[in-house]
Structures are given as structure tokens and as C-alpha cells.
């Protein structure tokens, strides 16, 4: 389906200073190809293309080289000796944001093309948990964070969930009041023995009962076993089963295509969530959320 929008009408797709969480709140649940462009909060002068695709919200960094073009652009030409800005996304370069959007009207990003900008009537929406529904999780692994908006934590930390803008990334608060995004597969549900929130955060956690984040919740989530550490590649091969199809960007030759049910040999586990592995004789990187690690003690049980 070809995109149905005017790329020159910047007011329809450019949102300026907008956080990742706010972008997700606007795009979550929208049909594939709905998008917006915002300023990067971690790299001043750059942009981010946020897109609803494959039942999630993806964020693509757009790097700007040279003087950043104003939005909307000024009709004036750049002064002599000053090179116009170039915009880069992946391996592609463009002279302007409209040109970039026109390109992705007919070319896939990951699993979708750009169809239309998100409606501004969606602004301010989101799924925020009420205080009386406060939910807590406990960290299964250390997480150092990869983005300014991430919340670093250590194994065993107790975090309060503030909202769930994405399936695999939730917004949480730690015992010091710091807030940020956390990867869902790195935590487990935590049910406090005491109803006191103040006693829970930073208090004694004995007597609590952890629950895996999978269980009765719908959808194919990639969840590590409770209290089982990430496997050590030095102990031998690690295998995973694909639980979510992935059709990578045709221009990314290092990305690994995945079909549900396929077996992947994991060769490298990166904290960023982009793992590396082999599948059907090909090597490449893939999101850890698309696979489920097999029981390394009894892998043959899952090899069918």
C-alpha cells in the first residue's frame, strides 16, 4: 500500500521535541505504517523517525551532517561556502526530510513502508497505571541502559511500573525516584508481602513471591526463565526458537531474517538486545524479543 500523505506538509508529521515514551504513546496500537518525525533527545541536531510496525513502535535515528536545516525550511539559500545539510538513515542519504519520507513511501523500513502521519488528535494519550494499581517488578539481570531514556538497574532491584507503552519496554521508577524505560525480559513480576509502597521500595523483600512475566498473559513474549541467568556462550552452543517473524530491511545485509519455529544458534548476546546468530546457514543480528531461549540442560526437547 502506497503512502497517502504530502511529505512537504511538515506540520502533519513533524512533532519537534517529543520523547520516545510520548512517541510510543501516540503510535502504539496504530496500524502499520503510521509514523511521526521528532527531534532526537540524545543527539542534538539529529531526528528520529518513529513508526508503528510489526505490532510495536520502532525508532530510526536520522543523522544530520553539516548545518541542520530549519523546520520548516527557510526559502533563503545557504550562505556561500556553507554546505547544505545531508540526512542519513541506515545506508541511505537524503537532502531533506521530505525526500527521505518519499523514499520510504515505497521502500520498507523493517516490515512496513510509511503510510500516513499519526493524527494530532492522539496527543496526550497513553496507558498510565493508577496509584491503586501500582505494579512492581524485580530485576533478573543487570541492565546498564543503552539510551538516555533507559533506566539502569542491578539484579535484585525492585522497580515500580509507571506505564506500559510497548510490549517489551515499560516505563519504571527505582528506589531513588529515577525513571526510565526497562526491557521486560530482564525482570519478573514482584508481589510484595506488605501493601505498603514505601516499605517495598528500598525495603526488605523477604517473603515476596515472584511470578514470571509470561504465564496467562496473551501474546508470544520472549521471556527468560525465572531466576535463570543469561547463558554463558563459553559453555557451548546456545539455541533459541523463533517466536516472531522478522523481515529485515533489504538494505541491511547484516540483519537476519526469521520465520516462526526456526532454530537459531546464538553466537553473541549483546546487552543492547541486538543478538547475533546463525539460521539456515546465514549469519546476522536480530532482536532478542523475536526468539525464546531453549532449555540449555535439555535442548533436544525443543528441537522438534
UniProtKB/Swiss-Prot annotation:
The keyword Cell membrane applies. The modification Phosphoserine is found at residues 40-41, 74, 83, 125. Keywords: Acetylation, Cell membrane, Cytoplasm, Membrane, Phosphoprotein, Proto-oncogene, Repeat, SH2 domain, SH3 domain. GO terms for biological process: actin cytoskeleton organization; cell chemotaxis; cell migration; cell population proliferation; cellular response to endothelin; cellular response to insulin-like growth factor stimulus; cellular response to nerve growth factor stimulus; cellular response to nitric oxide. GO terms for cellular component: actin cytoskeleton; cytoplasm; cytosol; extracellular exosome; membrane; neuromuscular junction; nucleus; plasma membrane. The modification N-acetylalanine is found at residue 2. The keyword Repeat applies. Phosphorylated on Tyr-221 upon cell adhesion. Results in the negative regulation of the association with SH2- and SH3-binding partners, possibly by the formation of an intramolecular interaction of phosphorylated Tyr-221 with the SH2 domain. This leads finally to the down-regulation of the Crk signaling pathway. Isoform Crk-II: Phosphorylated by KIT. One of its GO terms (molecular function) is SH2 domain binding. The record marks 237 as: Proline switch. CDD domains: SH2_CRK_like (cd09926), SH3_CRK_C (cd11759), SH3_CRK_N (cd11758). It holds the Pfam family SH3_2. Residues 67-82 have a biased composition (Pro residues). Disulfide bonds: none annotated. Component of a complex comprised of SH2D3C, BCAR1/CAS, and CRK. Within the complex, interacts with SH2D3C (via C-terminus), and BCAR1/CAS. Found in a complex with ABL1, ABL2, CRK and UNC119; leading to the inhibition of CRK phosphorylation by ABL kinases. Interacts with ABL1, C3G, DOCK3, DOCK5, MAP4K1, MAPK8 and SOS via its first SH3 domain. Interacts (via SH2 domain) with BCAR1, CBL, CBLB, PXN, IRS4 and GAB1 upon stimulus-induced tyrosine phosphorylation. Interacts (via SH2 domain) with several tyrosine-phosphorylated growth factor receptors such as EGFR and INSR. This is Adapter molecule crk. It comes from Homo sapiens (Human).
Amino acid at each position: 500500500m502506497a503512502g497517502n500523505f504530502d511529505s512537504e506538509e511538515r506540520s502533519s508529521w513533524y512533532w519537534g521535541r517529543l520523547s520516545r515514551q510520548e512517541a510510543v504513546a501516540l503510535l502504539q496500537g496504530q496500524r502499520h505504517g503510521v509514523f511521526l518525525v521528532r527531534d532526537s533527545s540524545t543527539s542534538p541536531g539529529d531526528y528520529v523517525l518513529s513508526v508503528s510496525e510489526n505490532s510495536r513502535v520502532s525508532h530510526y535515528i536520522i543523522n544530520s551532517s553539516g548545518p541542520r536545516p530549519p523546520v520548516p525550511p527557510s526559502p533563503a539559500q545557504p550562505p556561500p561556502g556553507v554546505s547544505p545539510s545531508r540526512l542519513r538513515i541506515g545506508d541511505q542519504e537524503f537532502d531533506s526530510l521530505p525526500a527521505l519520507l518519499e523514499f520510504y513511501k515505497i521502500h520498507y523500513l523493517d516490515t512496513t513502508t510509511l503510510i500516513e502521519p499519526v493524527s494530532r488528535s492522539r496527543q496526550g494519550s497513553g496507558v498510565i497505571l493508577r496509584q491503586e494499581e501500582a505494579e512492581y517488578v524485580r530485576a533478573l539481570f543487570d541492565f546498564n541502559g543503552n539510551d538516555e531514556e533507559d533506566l539502569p538497574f542491578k539484579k535484585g532491584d525492585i522497580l515500580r511500573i509507571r506505564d506500559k507503552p510497548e510490549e517489551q519496554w515499560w516505563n519504571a521508577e527505582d528506589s531513588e525516584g529515577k525513571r526510565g524505560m526497562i526491557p521486560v525480559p530482564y525482570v519478573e513480576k514482584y508481589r510484595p508481602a506488605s501493601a505498603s509502597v514505601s516499605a517495598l521500595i528500598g525495603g526488605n523483600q523477604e517473603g515476596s513471591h515472584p511470578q514470571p512475566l509470561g504465564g496467562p498473559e496473551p501474546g508470544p513474549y520472549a521471556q527468560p526463565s525465572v531466576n535463570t541467568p543469561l547463558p554463558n556462550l563459553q559453555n557451548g552452543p546456545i539455541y533459541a526458537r523463533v517466536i516472531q517473524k522478522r523481515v529485515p530491511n533489504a538494505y541491511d545485509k547484516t540483519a537476519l531474517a526469521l520465520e516462526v519455529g526456526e532454530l537459531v544458534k546464538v553466537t553473541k548476546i549483546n546487552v543492547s538486545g541486538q543478538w547475533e546468530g546463525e539460521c539456515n546457514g546465514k549469519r546476522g543480528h536480530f532482536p532478542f524479543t523475536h526468539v525464546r531461549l531453549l532449555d540449555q540442560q535439555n535442548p533436544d526437547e525443543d528441537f522438534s
